């Protein structure tokens, strides 16, 4: 696993082998970042189910100003810390997604890009989308990137702007409804 573009291009990232988790494949990441490239510069990013931090690190490599990494697994938090040594704008916290969203709500931070890549079998995206909207965590022109396999995403708050399939995985990108 590596950073595929930007300032840290070619940087090897420490991976992981933990049941129920899997990193985003390089070809999916490359396509995704080609799609969202215009949203990245000087953005504030949330990588909510961060895993190794690969998506947030890619955003930082391509010009994001800050990234907040949350994961509930201490092993993964330690991997994120190792993978981000020497990088600026890093905020890493061990927390499940519910507590993470509550913390962010209280801090009044709004994000330009939010990555949601939870363990597929848990079907957490709909709950996350509801909370992101209700807690007002997304800037008006921000986007939410969802990666999943089988979850049926149903949101009244966000508009689908891009939908791609990569093998058995889907990437959907949403923005706020106007």
State where each predicted segment sits.
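Class I S-adenosyl-L-methionine-dependent methyltransferase catalytic core
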Residues: 1-178
């Amino acid at each position: 696993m590596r950073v595929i573009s930007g300032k840290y291009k070619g940087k090897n990232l420490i991976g992981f082998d933990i049941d129920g988790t899997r990193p985003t494949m390089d070809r999916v990441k490359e396509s995704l970042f080609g799609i969202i490239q215009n949203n990245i510069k000087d953005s504030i990013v949330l990588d909510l189910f961060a895993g190794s931090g690969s998506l947030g690190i890619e955003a930082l490599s391509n010009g994001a100003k800050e990234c907040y990494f949350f994961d509930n697994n201490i092993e993964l938090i330690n991997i994120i810390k190792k993978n981000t040594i020497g990088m600026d704008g890093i905020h890493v916290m061990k927390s499940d997604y519910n507590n993470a969203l509550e913390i962010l709500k209280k801090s009044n931070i709004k994000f330009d890009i939010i990555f949601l890549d939870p363990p597929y079998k848990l079907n957490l995206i709909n709950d996350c989308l509801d909370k992101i909207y209700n807690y007002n965590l997304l800037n008006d022109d921000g986007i939410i990137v969802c990666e999943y396999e089988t979850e049926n995403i149903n949101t009244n708050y966000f508009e689908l702007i891009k939908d791609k399939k990569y093998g058995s995985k889907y990437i959907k990108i949403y923005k706020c409804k106007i």
